[in-house]
Amino acid sequence: MDLLAELQWRGLVNQTTDEDGLRKLLNEERVTLYCGFDPTADSLHIGNLAAILTLRRFQQAGHRPIALVGGATGLIGDPSGKKSERTLNAKETVEAWSARIKEQLGRFLDFEADGNPAKIKNNYDWIGPLDVITFLRDVGKHFSVNYMMAKESVQSRIETGISFTEFSYMMLQAYDFLRLYETEGCRLQIGGSDQWGNITAGLELIRKTKGEARAFGLTIPLVTKADGTKFGKTESGTIWLDKEKTSPYEFYQFWINTDDRDVIRYLKYFTFLSKEEIEALEQELREAPEKRAAQKALAEEVTKLVHGEEALRQAIRISEALFSGDIANLTAAEIEQGFKDVPSFVHEGGDVPLVELLVSAGISPSKRQAREDIQSGAIYVNGERLQDVGAILTAEHRLEGRFTVIRRGKKKYYLIRYA
């Protein structure tokens, strides 16, 4: 199976500008390709992951990827897929975000590869120094307003309105493609399905300025969920690639909770498991869905890719401890991750009666209820049931001297922190 056929099997090809021509090029030459990532926050998120991993697939097949950070285009704002005008971010903010995103992209590509090392570029390097007259003469002259108005990203905003700033975005992205075509020999741009208009604008600019049509575009489909909710969002917010914004445990849990209807598709999109391995997991899903083998494989592969082997091991340990109730063996760092979103209470002072702590931490509404909860066996301290109403929590109940985890009933967790 050639590269394009594999991408199609994985469901990673939405549209191509010339499928036969692209297949021939990829099979016969080492191709330089790029994908752009605008800094719209201080981290990339899992909505960016399919594109990042597609760059990696191209590199593994012998091609040369360029990850382009949109230090300039991020100052303008892409209207594609947006119902209203974006808020313009300060230059200093975009610069800081660009640096963070550059560092994240660096984890997925090989910059030392023999013959096809990856590169990271920032389009501010060539758009920043560009003066308005040069831009209008060398780029703007090649775009008719009629052509631009016909693009979906503009059409969808005709009613609500679009600023000239966002209207001109596609010309800047087109200029990126031309610039990389000239300086890096870049022949292919990939991007999400919402980027089709911007990618074809780049091909048009190359054709008009160079008099040749030797470049290609490929888009990746929008990742969807069978239940209709937005991929990459949970009740607690966006799933980020930065471990400070989304812990490896939360990240792992996101994937382990994948719907049966989505999991095989996601294995194809987000892992490097072979066709045979994925088909075996698909068969197991049909025969024994309760084992959730496909979800476990997905969570392990993607967490390892994004956060590394050690973070994956921690995420599994936390998940198993929460499932079994065996909290006492977790480290303070693992407790911090696993109980990030549970109610917490800071206890100032030394030893404290359990009844008193349950009330002051808001775990039980009254001392009477606290005593009833303890006697009925509903209270667990660090995973162990305590049924002594006279129990006093001492230093030995503090995990690494910092935390006590209290559970009331089957699933209500509380984290006690010590000042």
Curated annotation (Swiss-Prot):
InterPro entries: aa-tRNA-synth_I_CS, aa-tRNA-synth_Ic, Rossmann-like_a/b/a_fold, S4_RNA-bd, S4_RNA-bd_sf, SYY-like_C, Tyr-tRNA-ligase, Tyr-tRNA-ligase_bac-type
Record motif 'HIGH' region, residues: 39-48
Motif stretch ('KMSKS' region): 230-234
Binding site for L-tyrosine: Y34, Y169, Q173
Keyword tags: Aminoacyl-tRNA synthetase, ATP-binding, Cytoplasm, Ligase, Nucleotide-binding, Protein biosynthesis, RNA-binding
Listed name of the protein: Tyrosine--tRNA ligase
Gene Ontology CC annotations of this record: cytosol
Record organism: Geobacillus kaustophilus (strain HTA426)
